[in-house]
């Protein structure tokens, strides 16, 4: 009954208004308030501050600075296995596996369209048909920066407007097409394993999504917008494996897509597996 009421509330709540309010609170610089709120959050979610570059909670100018905190050098060593595809973020594997008939598995009884996830462009989605996906959920306690699984050159970025349903096991099992309905930023790269998409999916009270090349991705109008980076007039944007790609200001989910016969997921990983940025997520399929 509680789960049913929670799902009903997800459809009734003003998602974007709540997220804007959360954003205002997260950017508040009133010292006593931001210190108290940050301390409560760190204790409530058992955030490990010993690995943070700045351990003193009161040193952060606002909650968002704490939430997107940098880690100490070496806190997330990169797997050195030749050809290893790295996990892009801390969190847990929600699902991973093949993209079958153009659809990505969400939870028992639910899936969603890979084409819709990527913004609806059939040409962008085509290279991923029959490929592989991994969905990584970032919990409140996690490090909320997203990094490159492989070195790549940015081809395009797509802002896709949408709802801001909460992202958790209950919504994954009860909200159809959850990740293809929420607001998201699609980043398409050319890599040694062919096209790679990294999709940053928003959720309720996710105040914003940033990328290292564009900053806050907040178009003036909430409408689909594509940014091309492969035009001759632009300086190429190349990011090395393990480099920061973007970050969530109050986070959610990162989804990685590869084409067919390119990667093989680590056998030790499955739905619910805890992961850390930099560990091996997959190995390359040998040609």
Swiss-Prot record:
Named cofactor requirement(s): pyruvate
GO biological process, alphabetically ordered: phosphatidylethanolamine biosynthetic process
Cofactor note: Binds 1 pyruvoyl group covalently per subunit.
Site, as annotated: Cleavage (non-hydrolytic): 251-252
Modifications the protein undergoes after translation, according to the UniProt entry: Is synthesized initially as an inactive proenzyme. Formation of the active enzyme involves a self-maturation process in which the active site pyruvoyl group is generated from an internal serine residue via an autocatalytic post-translational modification. Two non-identical subunits are generated from the proenzyme in this reaction, and the pyruvate is formed at the N-terminus of the alpha chain, which is derived from the carboxyl end of the proenzyme.
Membrane-protein topology: Peripheral membrane protein
Cellular component aspect of the GO annotation: plasma membrane
Cellular localization per UniProt: Cell membrane
Family membership: Belongs to the phosphatidylserine decarboxylase family. PSD-B subfamily. Prokaryotic type I sub-subfamily.
PANTHER family with a match to the protein in the record: PHOSPHATIDYLSERINE DECARBOXYLASE, PHOSPHATIDYLSERINE DECARBOXYLASE PROENZYME, MITOCHONDRIAL
Protein name: Phosphatidylserine decarboxylase proenzyme
Gene symbol of the encoding locus: psd
């Amino acid at each position: 009954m509680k789960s049913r009421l929670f799902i009903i509330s997800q459809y009734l709540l003003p998602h974007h208004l709540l997220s804007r309010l959360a954003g205002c609170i997260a950017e508040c610089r009133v010292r006593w308030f931001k210190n108290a709120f940050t301390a409560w959050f760190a204790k409530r979610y058992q955030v490990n501050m010993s690995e943070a570059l700045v351990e003193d909670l009161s040193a952060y100018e606002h909650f968002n600075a704490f939430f997107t905190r940098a880690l100490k050098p070496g806190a997330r060593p990169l797997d050195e296995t030749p050809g290893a595809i790295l996990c892009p973020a801390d969190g847990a594997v929600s699902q991973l596996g093949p993209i079958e008939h153009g659809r990505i598995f969400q939870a028992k009884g639910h899936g969603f369209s890979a084409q819709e996830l990527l913004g609806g462009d059939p040409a962008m989605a085509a290279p991923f048909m029959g490929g592989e996906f991994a969905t990584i959920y970032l919990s409140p306690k996690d490090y909320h920066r997203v990094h490159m699984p492989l070195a790549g050159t940015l081809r395009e970025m797509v802002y896709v407007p949408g709802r801001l349903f909460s992202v958790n096991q209950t919504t994954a099992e009860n909200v159809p097409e959850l990740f293809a309905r929420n607001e998201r930023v699609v980043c398409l790269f050319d890599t040694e394993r062919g096209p790679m998409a990294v999709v940053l999916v928003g959720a309720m009270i996710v105040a914003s999504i940033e990328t290292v090349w564009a900053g806050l991705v907040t178009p003036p109008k909430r409408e689909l917008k594509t940014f091309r980076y492969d035009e001759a007039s632009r300086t190429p944007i190349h990011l090395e494996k393990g480099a920061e790609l973007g970050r969530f200001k109050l986070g959610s989910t990162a989804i990685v897509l590869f084409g067919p016969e390119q990667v093989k997921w680590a056998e030790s990983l499955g739905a619910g597996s805890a992961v850390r940025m930099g560990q091996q997520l997959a190995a390359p399929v040998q040609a």
